[in-house]
């Protein structure tokens, strides 16, 4: 199999409206090319001025995806990793803020020899250097670059100009542009409208870029007549107009693009020949399990602070898709707003009716903390499968301290610096840190598991590596009273100082982790903790259904009614 002499570049842009799915398109194309034997990497360029998304609100940006090397990046990198089963890195995500920062730093060091620093050429040249960086350092055949934003946005123009110049320098056989547009369906007229796509291509042409391939998102499949019309008015071959209609799950997108022969059109245009046929048997089986689960469905409640915006929990939600397929069930998600549970009259039994497991999600700040703690207490006392991630694990230790260890005023110093029992405290090396951006404990770190624990049972090994994003940790001063009351510290850092995993032995499934397992779950490698949690929730759900059959019933568990002293203020 002959490798291409030069790395081939594919740039993915989007038009008409945002949130069309450029990330899913890029990941799907990358997966198809990889399945043909090509070595593929994907990178994301964001036009905002922030250096990285690490300090951005989840309401504006969604989740922050952390790589092994500690980069805080765009959530689209999660799609890249889940689809390609390849790790990304710091160089996989570039923001305009980082570009400007680099240019200004160079100017301060005198590297421009006293010249007037301008967008053209200095900023554009910096972007071009970064665009080629991954291609130079990686062992690659194809590099896919997703350009964030929508054609017409002012902030995206430098990226587009850099792409235009690169195509001129490299030649059309080494770089192509795939433009993703929207073809709306007008119900009143019962037809698809191509005019928005035509206008989007016109705006792209104004930047000097003629798209090589058009991918058209639509509610309904595109007819041959529609494709011919789009091709005719957008100056592309109708074979290069790819339809991408709505589907039940994002994991069907690669199969739809394969049917539309997008990968073959890309390979032909880039001169890539003699590569194998893709073997997507596993992918088809996975999609079949997602769409037609053998054992029915269960519901998992995700308790969080940002439930109005599900993208804040994107990797967690996708991890449940993977774990559901591996357990032959569909996992339905019920988002639980933590603040709602802080009222004294909150009815947990009603809110959690039909819920077979509770995950308390990551987050920062004191808003909604007492609600999270009450959800954890309910899960612990009612023996409902519980899974806490990062802040969720910290809240679990606070709840355990207050209601089991009788440390009534226990808290985290993040929420109460003068708490009498600081069971969660700022990490020692964080106490002198002043800046917020990029200063947390970030990236992949090793963890040693305790033999005989639930964590060891699901991982089936002693040493694991997981990704982190936190400043606070469990306070080791309180280890003894916790262990005396039944808490197991089943995972720690290799030196034993930092608590990574806590669990309860006398519970159906009660596990809290300081790290972020959702960042390492992939289609072909479901994360063992998510698999185990869904398995426990499935057993709990099916057990409840058996109990509800019309046979002699046992006495029901008493309803949960926390004392006033336990409720948040």
Swiss-Prot record:
Residues the entry annotates as binding Mg(2+): 76, 146
Source organism, top-level taxon: Bacteria
Regulation affecting activity: Allosterically activated by GTP, when glutamine is the substrate; GTP has no effect on the reaction when ammonia is the substrate. The allosteric effector GTP functions by stabilizing the protein conformation that binds the tetrahedral intermediate(s) formed during glutamine hydrolysis. Inhibited by the product CTP, via allosteric rather than competitive inhibition.
Cellular compartments per GO CC: cytosol
Molecular function GO terms recorded: ATP binding; CTP synthase activity; glutaminase activity; identical protein binding; metal ion binding
Pfam entry (one): GATase
Entries under Gene3D superfamilies matching the protein: 3.40.50.880, P-loop containing nucleotide triphosphate hydrolases
Binding site for L-glutamine: 59, 363, 391-394, 414, 471
Disulfide bonds: none
Record note on quaternary structure: Homotetramer.
Record-stated family: Belongs to the CTP synthase family.
Name of protein: CTP synthase
Upper taxonomic lineage: Bacteria, Pseudomonadati, Chlorobiota, Chlorobiia, Chlorobiales
Gene: pyrG
């Amino acid at each position: 199999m002959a490798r291409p002499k030069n790395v081939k570049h594919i740039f993915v842009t989007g038009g008409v409206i945002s949130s069309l799915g450029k990330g899913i398109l890029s990941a799907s194309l990358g997966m198809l090319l990889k399945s043909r034997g090509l070595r593929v990497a994907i990178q994301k360029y964001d036009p905002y001025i922030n250096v990285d998304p690490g300090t951005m609100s989840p309401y504006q940006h969604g989740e922050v995806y952390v790589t092994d090397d500690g980069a805080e990046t765009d959530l689209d990198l999660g799609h890249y990793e889940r689809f390609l089963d390849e790790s990304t890195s710091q160089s996989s995500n570039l923001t305009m803020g980082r570009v400007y920062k680099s240019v200004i730093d160079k100017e301060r060091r005198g590297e421009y020899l006293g010249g007037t620093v301008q967008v053209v050429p200095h900023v554009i040249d910096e972007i071009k250097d970064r665009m080629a960086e991954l291609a130079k350092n990686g062992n690659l055949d194809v590099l896919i670059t997703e350009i964030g934003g929508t054609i017409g946005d002012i902030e995206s123009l430098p990226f587009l100009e850099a792409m235009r110049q690169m195509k001129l320098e490299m030649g059309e056989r080494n770089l192509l542009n795939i433009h993703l547009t929207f073809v709306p369906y007008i119900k009143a007229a019962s037809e698809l409208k191509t005019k928005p796509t035509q206008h989007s291509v016109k705006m792209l042409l104004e930047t000097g870029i003629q798209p090589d391939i058009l991918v058209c998102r639509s509610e309904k499949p595109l007819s041959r007549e529609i494709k011919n019309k789009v091709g005719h008015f957008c100056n592309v071959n109708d074979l290069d107009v790819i339809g991408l209609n709505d589907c039940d799950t994002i994991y069907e997108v690669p199969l739809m693009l394969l049917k539309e022969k997008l990968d073959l059109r890309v390979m032909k245009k880039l001169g890539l020949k003699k590569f194998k046929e893709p073997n997507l048997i596993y992918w088809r089986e996975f999609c079949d399990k997602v769409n037609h689960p053998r054992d029915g469905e269960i519901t998992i409640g995700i308790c969080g602070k940002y439930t109005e915006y599900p993208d804040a929990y994107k990797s967690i939600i996708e991890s449940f898709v993977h774990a559901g397929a591996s357990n032959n069930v569909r996992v339905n998600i019920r988002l639980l707003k933590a603040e709602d549970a802080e009222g004294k009259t909150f009815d947990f039994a009603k809110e959690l009716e039909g819920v077979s497991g509770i995950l308390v999600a990551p987050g920062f700040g004191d808003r909604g903390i007492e609600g999270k703690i009450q959800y954890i207490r309910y899960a612990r006392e009612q023996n409902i499968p519980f899974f806490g991630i990062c802040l969720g694990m910290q809240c679990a230790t606070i709840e355990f301290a207050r209601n089991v260890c009788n440390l009534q005023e226990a808290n985290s110093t993040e929420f109460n610096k003068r708490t009498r029992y600081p069971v969660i405290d700022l990490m020692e090396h964080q106490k002198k840190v002043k800046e917020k951006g990029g200063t947390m404990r970030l990236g992949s770190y090793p963890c040693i598991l305790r033999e005989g624990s639930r964590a060891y049972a699901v991982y089936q090994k002693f040493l694991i590596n997981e990704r982190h994003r936190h400043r606070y940790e469990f306070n080791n001063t309180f280890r003894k009273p916790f262990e005396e009351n039944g808490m197991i510290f089943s995972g720690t850092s290799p030196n034993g100082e930092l608590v990574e995993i806590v669990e309860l032995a006398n519970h159906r499934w009660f596990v809290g982790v300081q790290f972020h397992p959702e960042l390492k779950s992939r289609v072909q490698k479901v994360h063992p903790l998510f698999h185990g949690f869904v398995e426990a929730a499935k057993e709990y759900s099916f057990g409840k259904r058996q109990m509800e059959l019309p046979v002699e019933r046992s006495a029901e568990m008493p309803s949960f009614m926390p004392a006033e002293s336990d409720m948040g203020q």
